[in-house]
Each structure stands twice: as C-alpha cells, then as structure tokens.
Amino acid sequence: MKDNQEQAAPIVYWRIDEWFPDLSPDLRTRLKTYHEELLKFNRTLNLISAKTVFVADALHFADSIMASQAIMKSNPSLDKIYDLGSGNGFPGMIFALLYPKVQVVLVEFDQKKCEFLNHVAGVLKLSNVTVENRTIESFPDGSMKYVMARGLANISKSIMMTRKVVPKGGVFYHLKSEEWGIEVGDIPTQLCSVWAPSLVGEYKLPIGAIKFSVVKTDKIA
C-alpha cells in the first residue's frame, strides 16, 4: 500500500528548446546547464521560491530571455550593463549568454550568492560577466550608465537607490508585471523631475496569460 500512497514527484519542466528554437543549440545547452546548477544550489541558498522550481523554465528563464531581448532591441548599441541585486542571476546571466559582446556586471551583497554567480559564470565560460560583492551605494558616483533589475524593489525605491551611481543620460531598466503603471503613478513628484519613465516593451510568457513588462527610467537631470 505504501507505493500507492506515495505521490509521484512533480515534474521539473524544461521547454526552452521548444519555445526558443531560434536560439543556437550551444546557447540552449548552456541555458540548460544553468538551470541544472540553479536547482542544485537552490537546495541550500534559496535562490528561487520553491513554488517556482518546477516551472523555472517559464517564470525565470523565458522571462529573462524575453526581457533581455526587449532591452537590447531598444538599445542595440549597449556595451555594458549592471544587474542590481542579481542574486540568482536573473536577468543578468541570461543577458550575458544572449549577448556575449556586452559586458554584464552582476551586483549582489550576499557573499554566498556571489559565490554561486561566480561558479555559474565559470561553468558557462562567460568571459563577459563580472560579479561584484558590494552594495549599490558603494560604487562611484555616475559609474553606471545602464542598469537593470528584476525584483529589486519598486520603481521609486530603485531609482532612489541609484540616484548617485547613475549619471545624467543613464537608463534604468525595470522588469515588471502588467501593473507597472501603478508603480509609475506612485513615483514622487520630485523624482519625476529627475527621471522620465516609459514603456520599453510588453510580452507574455509561453505559458499563462499574464503580461510582463520592461519599463525604463531615463535620468534627465
């Protein structure tokens, strides 16, 4: 009876090959390797929520692929970008895999998560990735022209955190849900005189009906 009572282990999906056939076989293999390393280290580091483990291919990988493509399409001359609060490597590690000519700096305060990021960058042989184990505020003023973040904070808090490190003319790309307009509406008036928000792109994941968005804030003063 024991065998009948035991429930089958949930399936951990991997559908990137099916969803993104335009990506090269080598790139899809490296994405799968990243997925395997993520699940292995997640047992001790809590890199992603347990609820998302089985559909990480959609909620983390596909989301980061589509967001990265939207960012690059809007700014094809991009040559360096900072991923703030990188933690599990989304979207920065994915961005680096997709665009090997772009230098990607993963900024993370947690040392153990930085060790994970360095490990993955090494396994994937990503020479365009640098991991910085430090706070955002510790970077020199005006040193980050292009930055992005996924799950760091709401837009208001994110631009407050980077008000010194992002120079005039710099851009912050925020990965958000379809309710991004609420966050934009909550930006204090004094910040709106310094940062100009706009929508870069919207997309739906290969599963589900929820829209995801990339919103940018241009630093205008």
Swiss-Prot record:
It is an enzyme of class 2 (transferase). Its EC number is 2.1.1.170. The keyword DNA repair does not apply. Keywords: Cytoplasm, Methyltransferase, rRNA processing, S-adenosyl-L-methionine, Transferase. GO terms for cellular component: cytosol. Its main location: cytoplasm. One of its GO terms (molecular function) is rRNA (guanine-N7-)-methyltransferase activity. CDD domains: AdoMet_MTases. S-adenosyl-L-methionine binds at residues 85, 90, 136-137, 150. InterPro entries: rRNA_ssu_MeTfrase_G, SAM-dependent_MTases_sf. It catalyses: guanosine(527) in 16S rRNA + S-adenosyl-L-methionine = N(7)-methylguanosine(527) in 16S rRNA + S-adenosyl-L-homocysteine. Transmembrane segments: none annotated. It is found in: Cytoplasm. It comes from the Bacteria. NCBIfam families: rsmG_gidB (TIGR00138). Specifically methylates the N7 position of guanine in position 527 of 16S rRNA. Belongs to the methyltransferase superfamily. RNA methyltransferase RsmG family. HAMAP family: 16SrRNA_methyltr_G (MF_00074). PANTHER family: S-ADENOSYL-L-METHIONINE-DEPENDENT METHYLTRANSFERASES SUPERFAMILY PROTEIN (PTHR31760:SF0). This is Ribosomal RNA small subunit methyltransferase G 3. The gene is rsmG3.
